[in-house]
């Protein structure tokens, strides 16, 4: 049939959730749908059915389409490693590391690869729902663009512009985007959506009509604030504010927000647990002394994040927590930090060198160019699980004699200290498994793990689709996709 693309008046206007919601709304109409994002920048990634990696947002959108995530859904992924360098992933595989200035030139030849992925998806479905990146209004980035209008024009995909009314100034944002675009780019936009509206939509009716009059574009609807979004995997390491200690009967789980934190949505399943209070600890604050569990998350730059952790004094908090006999769980990069040493002799993450780890697990990590990407199934803490590995380097040492997990293929993963309170694993997605979550929480003295996280996410996608169906002219978007793309 065709395709439709959502672009935004800026970053964080809610494109990812709207794409997921539209994908599910189209699926509910009996259509075969695929998500697509030409270029993404994120350290939150997922392993695909073809053994590659894509942004977690596109993996969620695939779930909304009721299909397996595939590397074609996000052919170009940039994973920031430092302020001015990113790892370049193309078709799910690492191509190298680029500086921010280098990418402008490097992206030009990538358009053909992006279009090849898009065309393969087109052959599989009725509608491709495409998500842009940032905003087409960033006209300083237009030359060589593959994420927004560069892709839309090359593929002939009609565009709908998304504006975020919650942040204010949405009329200026939509009309201003129209004003700065090249006429040929502006011609690709066939209408707009207003997102994140709170209150009575009748109060914005005049503003909505003014946008139509000033831009010359039709409106496709006003989407309300979607409460069900809170039940979806996080796109950002949201700081959950604490007021006093944990509520009676609840235990506190704390996770420090590291500069290059990755796959922090590993912790989202804990939000389902009524007996758990999850707190993401921002820089400048101590890890709460009353925490029952500290989780060290994944990292795109383990050595740099380990230095940042020490600069915050969090290593002192972690050691004090350990002396109190409380639990610590390190995931991927966090697991590497818990060991005695992290070595990077080939300069994978930065200048070659090695640093001492926290020394809470008797293992050492050696980073190397080869990247491990695979889905896994196995048993840990006497519970079944599935998940995925996504890491560079290998970890070994005497502590590996007490592995955290055993995979079905016979391999082992991670380590547990002799006291059983410090645990490390390379597996992402562990806590999404209800039985394993229940086993971990039992170690903290609470009963949990009763809710199916995947079912909760699926129900949230249905709820978002229902809201979109009530407030958006979905039939008109289907017709737009059929007419173009």
From Swiss-Prot:
Classification via InterPro entries: Class_I_gatase-like, CobQ/CobB/MinD/ParA_Nub-bd_dom, CobQ_GATase1, CobQ_N, CobQ_synth, GATase_3, P-loop_NTPase
Keywords for the protein's UniProt record, in alphabetical order: Cobalamin biosynthesis, Glutamine amidotransferase
Keyword Lipid metabolism: no
GO biological process: cobalamin biosynthetic process
Family of the protein in this entry: Belongs to the CobB/CobQ family. CobQ subfamily.
PROSITE patterns: GATASE_COBBQ
Pfam families according to UniProt: CbiA, GATase_3
Known pathway: Cofactor biosynthesis; adenosylcobalamin biosynthesis
Domain GATase cobBQ-type as annotated: residue spans: 250-436
Protein name per the record: Cobyric acid synthase
Role this protein plays: Catalyzes amidations at positions B, D, E, and G on adenosylcobyrinic A,C-diamide. NH(2) groups are provided by glutamine, and one molecule of ATP is hydrogenolyzed for each amidation.
HAMAP family listed in its UniProt record: CobQ
């Amino acid at each position: 049939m065709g395709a439709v693309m959502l672009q935004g008046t800026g970053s964080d206007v809610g494109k990812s959730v709207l794409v997921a919601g539209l994908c599910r709304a189209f699926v509910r109409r009996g259509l075969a749908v695929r998500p697509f994002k030409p270029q993404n920048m994120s350290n939150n990634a997922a392993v695909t059915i073809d053994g590659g990696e894509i942004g977690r947002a596109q993996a969620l959108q695939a779930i909304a389409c009721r299909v397996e995530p595939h590397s074609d859904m996000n052919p170009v992924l940039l994973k920031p490693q430092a302020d001015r360098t990113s790892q370049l992933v193309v078709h799910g595989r690492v191509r190298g590391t680029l500086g921010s200035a280098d990418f402008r030139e490097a992206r030009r030849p990538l358009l053909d690869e992006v279009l090849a992925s898009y065309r393969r998806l087109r052959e599989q479905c009725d509608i491709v729902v495409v998500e842009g990146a940032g905003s087409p209004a960033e006209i300083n980035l237009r030359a060589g663009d593959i994420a927004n209008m560069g892709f839309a024009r090359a593929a002939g995909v009609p565009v709908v512009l998304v504006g975020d009314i919650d942040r204010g100034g949405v009329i200026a944002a939509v009309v201003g985007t129209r004003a700065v675009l090249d006429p040929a780019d502006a011609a690709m936009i066939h209408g707009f959506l207003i997102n994140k509206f709170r209150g009575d939509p009748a109060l914005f009716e005049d503003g909505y009509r003014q946008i139509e009059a000033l831009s010359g574009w039709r409106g496709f609807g006003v989407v309300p604030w979607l409460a069900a979004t809170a039940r979806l995997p996080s796109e950002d390491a949201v700081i959950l504010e604490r007021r006093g200690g944990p509520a009676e009967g609840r235990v506190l789980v704390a996770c420090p927000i590291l500069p290059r934190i990755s796959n922090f949505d590993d912790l989202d399943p804990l939000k389902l647990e009524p007996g758990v209070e999850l707190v993401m600890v921002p820089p400048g604050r101590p890890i709460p002394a009353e925490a029952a569990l500290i989780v060290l998350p994944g990292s795109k730059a383990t050595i740099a994040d380990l230095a940042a952790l020490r600069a915050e004094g969090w290593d002192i908090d972690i050691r004090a927590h350990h002396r109190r006999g409380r639990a610590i769980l390190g995931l991927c990069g966090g697991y590497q930090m818990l060991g005695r040493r992290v070595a990077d002799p080939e300069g994978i993450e930065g200048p070659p060198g090695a640093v001492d780890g926290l020394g809470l697990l008797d293992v050492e990590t050696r980073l190397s160019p080869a990247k491990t990407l695979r889905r896994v199934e196995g048993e840990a803490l006497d519970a079944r699980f599935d998940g995925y590995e996504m890491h560079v380097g290998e970890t070994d040492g005497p502590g590996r004699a007490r592995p955290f997990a055993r995979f079905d293929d016979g391999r082992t993963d991670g380590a547990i200290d002799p006291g059983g309170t410090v645990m490390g694993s390379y597996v992402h997605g562990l806590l999404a498994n209800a039985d394993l979550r229940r086993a971990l929480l039992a170690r903290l003295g609470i009963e949990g793990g009763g809710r199916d996280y995947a079912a909760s996410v699926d129900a949230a996608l249905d709820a978002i689709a229902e809201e979109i169906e009530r407030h958006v002219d979905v039939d008109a978007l289907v017709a737009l996709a059929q007419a173009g793309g």
